[in-house]
Curated annotation (Swiss-Prot):
Disruption phenotype: Leads to an inability to detect L-canavanine. The gene is Gr8a. Gustatory receptor which mediates acceptance or avoidance behavior, depending on its substrates. Required for sensing and avoiding L-canavanine, a plant-derived insecticide. It is found in: Cell membrane. GO terms for molecular function: ligand-gated monoatomic ion channel activity; taste receptor activity. InterPro entries: 7TM_chemorcpt (IPR013604). GO terms for cellular component: axon; dendrite; membrane; neuronal cell body; plasma membrane. Keywords: Cell membrane, Membrane, Receptor, Transducer, Transmembrane, Transmembrane helix. This is Gustatory receptor 8a. GO terms for biological process: chemosensory behavior; detection of chemical stimulus involved in sensory perception of taste; male courtship behavior; monoatomic ion transmembrane transport; response to insecticide; response to L-canavanine; sensory perception of taste; signal transduction. The chain crosses the membrane at residues 39-59, 70-90, 132-152, 155-175, 249-269, 285-305, 348-372. It comes from Drosophila melanogaster (Fruit fly).
Length: 385
């Protein structure tokens, strides 16, 4: 990575380096090639260590899995297995997608993402406000629920062993999800900037149309600006493709891991309540309930900007006395076709679009799962044995 990053962005990218999620050296790192090799070796070490931890938990004779009944044991094993799936996807993709990630940041700097002057810390916080709220709200909620839970819940050996090994996997999954959000916020920033500039062009043309005041070469000016905006949009579209190339598999794995955890914990919550088992640790799914909406909100926020750009594009006046320009109309049509053929569409390997309708489908799937559990759990009671 070349260029200069703001302090907020630099700090959080450094955090992702420590977690093994970001394998590129940051601006200012000495000997970038050696730093890259060390980061990749660190990611590989974390992958092997965490995978060994999960295998040890699954096959150890200690109480990492719930031993009270096979149902609880299977639930804990399922959470470990899908957490391992998420870990594999995260670190293997980190190791294999360096080129896509490097291209993403190169395009970001090319579009003006580097801070050439002194930018106040307050401005940086405002720029990444939504990402910072998602990140630190999740961290605060997770810590607060843990601190509150263990004041009322007896800490058995099983709970100590399970949560001391499973909770790090949960945090890695959450932080990877918020890494997606950070990159989507950078995409959204470029798109909203383009929308503002298109709005200014529409205002210029409308003012010229209503007042009859313009300057020689006004048509050429508008056309040049439109061509420039088309190039910017093309670079933003390339950023999207690089984002998908860098994170596609781990997006699917992380969302699946979080969704499976929610479904399993909801199932086990009803099972515990039905069998009068005192177990309050299912409250720990509350942060998980916020993770998927946070990512989908960031994804949806990117995708909804493109129709607004198209709206501003078609607000440019071309049929007034001062700028009755067939060439300008043709340029607008060309840009419109570009928006149509290069859509900002964020999906999981082409399987499903990551918009708000996905939340509805996931809620329905968990609801269906709970309906089946309500019908089948009585069959596990002694009267049916």
């Amino acid at each position: 990575m070349s260029g200069h990053l703001g302090r907020v962005l630099q700090f959080h990218l450094r955090l992702y380096q420590v977690l093994g999620f970001h394998g590129l050296p940051l601006p200012g790192d000495g000997n970038p090639a050696r730093t890259r090799r060390r980061l990749m070796a660190w990611s590989l070490f974390l992958l092997i260590s965490l995978s060994a931890l999960v295998l040890a938990c699954l096959f150890s004779g200690e109480e990492f899995l719930y031993r009270g009944d096979m149902f609880g044991c299977a639930n804990d094993a399922l959470k470990y297995v899908f957490a391992e799936l998420g870990v594999l996807a995260i670190y293997l993709e980190t190791l294999s997608s360096q080129r896509h990630l490097a291209n993403f940041w190169w395009l970001h700097f090319k579009l003006g993402g580097q801070k050439t002057g002194l930018v106040s810390l307050r401005s940086e916080f405002q720029q990444f406000c939504r990402y910072l709220i998602f990140l630190y709200a999740m961290m605060a909620a997770e810590v607060a629920i843990h601190l509150g839970l263990w004041q009322f819940q007896a800490l058995t050996q099983h709970m100590l062993l399970f949560w001391s090994t499973y909770e790090p996997l949960v945090w890695l999954t959450y932080l990877r999800n918020l890494q997606f959000v950070l990159h989507l916020e950078l995409l959204r920033e470029q798109l909203t900037g383009l929308e503002r500039e298109m709005g200014l062009l529409a205002e210029y043309s409308r003012f010229a149309s209503e007042t009859g005041r313009s300057f020689p070469g006004f048509e050429s000016f508008l056309r040049r600006r439109l061509v420039q905006k088309q190039r910017i949009y093309s670079h933003v579209y390339d950023m999207l493709k690089c984002f998908q190339g860098a994170f596609n598999f781990s997006i699917l794995a992380v969302l699946l891991t979080i969704n499976i955890r929610i479904a399993v914990d909801c199932y086990f919550m009803y099972y515990s309540i039905y069998n009068n088992v005192i177990n309050n640790d299912y409250y720990l799914i509350v942060p998980a309930l916020l993770e998927i909406p946070a990512f989908i909100y960031a994804s949806q926020s990117c995708m909804v900007v493109v129709p607004r750009i198209a709206h501003q594009l078609h607000n440019i006046v071309t049929d007034s006395g001062c700028c009755s320009c067939p060439d300008l109309s043709l340029q607008i049509q060309n840009f419109s076709l570009q928006l149509l053929h290069q859509p900002i569409r964020i999906d999981c390997l082409g399987l499903t679009i990551l918009d708000c309708s996905l939340l509805t489908r996931m809620a329905c799937s968990v609801g269906t799962y709970m309906i089946y559990s309500i019908q089948f759990i009585p069959k596990f009671s002694n009267t049916y044995m």
